């Protein structure tokens, strides 16, 4: 039997509640936190308790009843409060309880331990796990048509901390919240070495991309490890504090006065921007320490054990307040996405360790726009000098404005590069702009100097000859063109039919880059003439797709042949390898009549050094690129995903297989030597790596099989590209 103090209409459907004049709005103590979490009073409800009818937007109102489950019989099922919560439609249905509690102002630990029961009208309530077993079901899929008769009952457990929760009660949500707390102290690679979960699984769980819930056995194993970890951490803190404060007459310098500590705690509780609500037992212990620890000396009458306990507790409270004050200065919606640190793009020759801590500002997009206006530079120039990509990709990044805290590794690498560039002095940035303009006006000079320049400027614009796509206008009149969202599927089907890459299709169809086409197919925005840029680009693609199939195949073939010839001309014009190019030309087997140049005396037999020159041109990692890769390993780990490898390859102007071999070698040294391979101020050539120095698939553990498979696929793609390019180069020579 449910015991409630409100009107019986609360037990019925929200329709009955909306018609009752006795039902009041939510408690005033929760109003500030609700508005802070994006639930304004006007959208949440009316004075008589009725819910707004319009749900055509991004939110769905859900009536929540929060119940506290205590151990005593008297308050065995005590209701805390009941009110409406606006929930985004794209939230996973399995995360409905956690999202609702966070919107109501509860802590992450409380949300992780809560259980949800859903009630539809007068039907019997069911646990959320019984409603659907689809891991990717969203709130809109389940509640879009019945939200007005749904009541979500949330039962809170009595455990105040995650480490107090029994291992048998750990579930997917509990593991996710525990990981978020741990990732505030360490990065993913370090955590993966200590906990039972792999790094890829940790990243997927925290980013909510791991749709299949973790098994109950794995959750219980993680819960047991978490309790041991917390216990060991507390003991270590006690030992450190005991060694520091063993002299009773000496007051710790970093430990504040308890009066100041209490005032800081009150200030932190009243902070409107703080998203962390500490549990009640920790807050109540602040005034309890005042009679024990005075502003002067510690009382010598206390037992050593009690002194250690009080010092450890004060240290923990100090850490809690420091974390809360840090989070109070961040964006209000930065709830739990501060766990990923990604590499900066240093400009110095030697990598600076301090650059690895550069964080991406939430207003990075506005900073970029302000910089474009201040320096009067185009997006193409800024994209080239800031993160060495194309104007199309920068335009897509500025248009999407994804939150850096929830972005992918690839986007974060680009944002880090832009942030690092904007942190340079204004005079230095202007000088870089001027150098880029000069290189653009003198492409031949930039092509010769590209061999000795840094990776940030090595991908300079080259002299572009006429391509087969010059007759295709970039902008077309789309007034009479019928374009729908189905064009995205047509693009993918065309690439599969013709067996062409995204880069090739983007070049011939819209004169764009592969990154731009990748973003286009990722977002699949609804085509509309109001979005002029998107509409014109899609019109160009539509015009290309309307060509006969044989004409499109001819264009693909011509562009592919032109690409290989342009690449060969670039290799011939590079000065560091004239002997190598001559050797390759003279060593080609002839199928027809011998040309006159073969009458020259044969070249000397190739040595090991001359044979190794060719791979070194594309396998040598400079000092600056080495600093970027080492920073990536330090902040992200040894297992970058495919998108991050693609971004690093484009940013450092290195082939993907070179970057993959570098990471494989580093993993080999970590596995067999317990540390990363040190490079003492010298460049690295992955061609010098021996086969036994690359971590093979048999030596990878289960958590790393996915990454190794991806590396093999990338290497095979690179080898396939080289084998395809060889016949074309032979014909050209």
From Swiss-Prot:
Annotated function: Binds to DNA, at nuclear matrix- or scaffold-associated regions. Thought to recognize the sugar-phosphate structure of double-stranded DNA. Transcription factor controlling nuclear gene expression, by binding to matrix attachment regions (MARs) of DNA and inducing a local chromatin-loop remodeling. Acts as a docking site for several chromatin remodeling enzymes and also by recruiting corepressors (HDACs) or coactivators (HATs) directly to promoters and enhancers.
Similarity comment text for this entry: Belongs to the CUT homeobox family.
PROSITE patterns per record: CMP (PS51982), CUT (PS51042), CUTL (PS51983), HOMEOBOX_2 (PS50071)
Expression sites by tissue: Expressed in cortical neurons that extend axons across the corpus callosum. Also expressed in branchial arches and in cells of the osteoblast lineage, but not in chondrocytes and osteoclasts.
CDD domains with a match to the protein in the record: homeodomain, SATB1_N
Organism of provenance: Mus musculus
Low complexity: bias regions: 441-458
GO molecular function: chromatin binding; DNA-binding transcription activator activity, RNA polymerase II-specific; DNA-binding transcription repressor activity, RNA polymerase II-specific; RNA polymerase II cis-regulatory region sequence-specific DNA binding; RNA polymerase II transcription regulatory region sequence-specific DNA binding; sequence-specific DNA binding
Protein name, UniProt field: DNA-binding protein SATB2
Residue(s) of cross-link: Glycyl lysine isopeptide (Lys-Gly) (interchain with G-Cter in SUMO): 233, 350
Limits of the CMP domain: 57-158
Crosslink site: Glycyl lysine isopeptide (Lys-Gly) (interchain with G-Cter in SUMO2): 24, 30, 161, 350, 475, 724
SUPFAM superfamilies assigned to the protein according to its UniProt record, in alphabetical order: Homeodomain-like (SSF46689), lambda repressor-like DNA-binding domains (SSF47413)
Region (Disordered): 1-47, 435-473, 580-617, 691-733
Gene: Satb2
Disrupted-gene phenotype: Malformations in 2 of the major axonal tracts interconnecting the cortical hemispheres: the corpus callosum (c.c) and the anterior commissure (a.c). Misrouted afferent and efferent cortical axon connections. Impaired migration of upper-layer neurons. Ectopic expression of Ctip2. Craniofacial abnormalities and defects in osteoblast differentiation and function.
Subunit structure: Interacts with PIAS1. Interacts with ATF4 and RUNX2; resulting in enhanced DNA binding and transactivation by these transcription factors.
Subcellular location: Nucleus matrix
Any one biological process term the GO annotation gives: embryonic pattern specification
UniProt KW keywords: Chromatin regulator, Chromosomal rearrangement, Developmental protein, DNA-binding, Homeobox, Isopeptide bond, Nucleus, Phosphoprotein, Repeat, Repressor, Transcription, Transcription regulation, Ubl conjugation
Pfam families: CUT (PF02376), CUTL (PF16557), Homeodomain (PF00046), ULD (PF16534)
InterPro entries in the record: CUT_dom (IPR003350), CUTL (IPR032355), HD (IPR001356), Homeodomain-like_sf (IPR009057), Lambda_DNA-bd_dom_sf (IPR010982), SATB1/SATB2 (IPR039673), SATB_CUTL_sf (IPR038216), SATB_ULD_sf (IPR038224)
Ranges for domain CUTL: 161-234
GO CC field: chromatin; histone deacetylase complex; nuclear matrix; nucleoplasm; nucleus; transcription regulator complex
């Amino acid at each position: 039997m449910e015991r409630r103090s409100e009107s019986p209409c609360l037990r019925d459907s929200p329709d009955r509640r909306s018609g009752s004049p006795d039902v009041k709005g939510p408690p005033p103590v929760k109003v500030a936190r609700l508005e802070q979490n994006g639930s304004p009073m006007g959208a949440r409800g009316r004075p008589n308790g009725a819910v707004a009818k319009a749900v055509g937007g991004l939110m769905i109102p859900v009536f929540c009843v929060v119940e506290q489950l205590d151990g005593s019989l008297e308050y065995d099922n005590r209701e805390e409060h009941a009110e409406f919560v606006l929930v985004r439609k794209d939230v996973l249905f399995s995360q409905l309880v956690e999202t609702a509690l966070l919107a109501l102002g509860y802590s992450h630990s409380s949300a992780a331990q809560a259980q949800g029961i859903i009630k539809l009208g007068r039907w019997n309530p069911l646990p959320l796990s019984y409603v659907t077993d689809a891991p990717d079901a969203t709130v809109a899929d389940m509640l879009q048509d019945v939200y007005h008769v749904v009541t979500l009952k949330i039962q809170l457990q009595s455990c105040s901390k995650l480490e107090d929760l029994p291992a048998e009660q750990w579930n997917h949500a509990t593991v996710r919240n525990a990981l978020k707390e741990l990732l505030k102290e360490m990065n993913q690679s370090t955590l993966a070495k200590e906990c039972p979960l792999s790094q890829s699984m940790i990243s997927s769980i925290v980013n909510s991309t791991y749709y299949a819930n973790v098994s109950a056995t794995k959750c219980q194993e993680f819960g047991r490890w978490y309790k041991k970890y917390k216990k060991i951490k507390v003991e270590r803190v006690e030992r450190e504090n005991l060694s520091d404060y063993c002299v009773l007459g000496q007051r710790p310098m970093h430990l504040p006065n308890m009066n100041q500590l209490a005032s800081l705690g009150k200030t932190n509780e009243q902070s409107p921007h703080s998203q962390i609500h500490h549990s009640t037992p920790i807050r109540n212990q602040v005034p309890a320490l005042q009679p024990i620890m005075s502003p002067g000396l510690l009382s010598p009458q206390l037992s050593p054990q009690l002194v250690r306990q009080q010092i450890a507790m004060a240290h923990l409270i100090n850490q809690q307040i420091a974390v809360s004050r840090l989070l109070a200065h961040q964006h209000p919606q930065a709830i739990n996405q501060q766990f990923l640190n990604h590499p900066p793009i240093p400009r110095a020759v030697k990598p600076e360790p301090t650059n690895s801590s550069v964080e991406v500002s939430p207003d990075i997009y506005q900073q970029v726009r302000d910089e474009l206006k201040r320096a009067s530079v185009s997006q193409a120039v800024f994209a080239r000098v800031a993160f060495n990509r194309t104007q199309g990709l920068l335009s897509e990044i500025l248009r999407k404005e994804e939150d850096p805290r929830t972005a992918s590794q690839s986007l974060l690498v680009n944002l880090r590069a832009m942030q690092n560039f904007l942190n340079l002095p204004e005079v230095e940035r202007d000088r870089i702009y001027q150098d880029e303009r000069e290189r653009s006006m003198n492409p031949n000079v930039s092509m010769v100097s590209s061999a000795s320049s840094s990776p940030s400027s090595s991908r300079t614009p080259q002299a572009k000859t006429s391509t087969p796509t010059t007759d295709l206008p970039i902008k077309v009149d789309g007034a009479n063109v019928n374009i729908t969202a189905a064009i995205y599927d047509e693009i993918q089907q065309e690439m599969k039919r013709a067996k062409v890459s995204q880069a090739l299709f983007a070049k011939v169809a819209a004169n764009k880059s592969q990154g731009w086409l990748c973003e286009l197919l990722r977002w699949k925005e609804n085509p509309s003439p109001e979005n002029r840029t998107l509409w014109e680009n899609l019109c160009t693609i539509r015009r290309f797709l309307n060509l006969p199939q044989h004409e499109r195949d001819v264009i693909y073939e011509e562009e592919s042949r032109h690409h290989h010839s342009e690449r060969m001309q670039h290799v011939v014009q590079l000065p560091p390898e004239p002997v190598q190019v001559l050797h390759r030309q003279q060593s080609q087997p002839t199928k027809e009549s011998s040309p006159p140049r073969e009458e020259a005396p044969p070249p000397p037999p190739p040595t090991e050094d001359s044979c190794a020159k060719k791979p070194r041109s594309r396998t040598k990692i400079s000092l600056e690129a080495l600093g970027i890769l080492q920073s990536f390993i330090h902040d992200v780990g040894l297992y970058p995903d495919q998108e991050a490898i693609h971004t690093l390859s484009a940013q450092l102007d290195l082939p993907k297989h070179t970057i993959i071999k570098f990471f494989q070698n580093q993993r080999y040294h970590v596995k067999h030597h317990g540390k990363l391979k040190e490079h003492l101020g010298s460049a690295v050539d992955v061609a010098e790596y021996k086969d036994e120095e690359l971590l093979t698939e048999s030596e990878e553990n289960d958590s790393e099989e996915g990454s190794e498979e991806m590396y093999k696929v990338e290497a095979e793609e690179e080898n396939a590209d080289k084998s395809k390019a060889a016949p074309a180069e032979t014909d050209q020579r």
